[in-house]
Structures are given as structure tokens and as C-alpha cells.
Amino acid sequence: MGGSEACRGLAFIVEGATEKVFYLEYLSQLCAAKGLALRKDLDTQEDRYAITSANGEKVVMMASVNSVSQMTNSATWFDRACVGENPEIAWTVFLCYDTDEYNSDITKFHEGDWAMLRESISPAAQKVVDLAAKADIEDVMLCDLPGVLSFLGLPPETEMPLGNKGKTKLKKLYRKVAPNKAY
């Protein structure tokens, strides 16, 4: 999958590993619903994928920063891995994060370091899109408990674990599948 084959690129800068799994699975389901093929590029160390259709190919790149406070440093990744490796591609950047609370003011993600991040990637990005979950992403994911259970390979009758936070509940579900692996 060479960069010269594609004319569009989608760069997902996600807050953490859970968001990465969520958005990759969501993208996979969207592609399947639209009859598009999504495949991982096994020739690179980057999280690089291709969406193939009758109209051509789109490059998808994913970077997980593992903390919303580190997301502002991802302009370097975008410049190196996306634009640097594929200068001929028109890029749309998705900033994927959760606000941690349903009533958080999303405008804080347009100020300070966040404004500098947007400014840093804007010259090379055709468009910058916020994909902000107005809660913890784990709480959003658990709104579709049957889908989560199916994804984890758990029986449909598995009950929602106890806990106040979605992350705690999701961790308990994950441990039912992989008790000896870190969440």
C-alpha cells in the first residue's frame, strides 16, 4: 500500500488505547456497512490502514497519545508519519478525546495548548475535526453492552459488572476474557 496510490488521508489522534480500539472498530463497521475494505498495512511499524473502494484508496493513520495532556505533542507525529511519509495526500485530522464528564465545557479544547496543536497541524491538514465524547469513552461504549460482549467474545447473557465508572466495568468484562493480561 504505497502513499502514491491514495489521494486522501484520515489521521486519528486518540487519547488512549481504549479510544483507539473504539474508533478503529467503529471505522471497521462503517466500512463493512458501506461495502468498503479496511485493511492494516503490515509493512510498517505505524498504525496504518487503507480503505479501498471502487473510487480508490484512502490512508488511515492512528496515533494513541495515552493521555489527553500529551495530545498537544501529536503535531510532531502528524508531520513525520502522515505528511512527511505522504506529502501528496490531502489530510483530515480527527482529534478523538473524551471530556470525562457529560457537562464539561468542550471549548477548553480550543484554548491554550490545544489552540497551538490546531495551529501546528492546520497548514498541512485540509480539515481538523473534533470527535469528543461528552463522558468517559468507556461509558459511551457500554451504551451498547451487547456489542461490547460480542466484541469481547462473551455470552450475551453476561451481566453488566458493578462499579461507578465505565472504565472499571469494562476492565472487569475484559478480565473475564483475559484474566492474566493488563487491560
Question: Which residues does each predicted region cover?
Answer:
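Short, surface-exposed loop/strand segments
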Residues: 1-88
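Short glycine-/polar-rich loops that comprise or flank the Walker A/P-loop
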Residues: 7-8, 89-91, 123-128
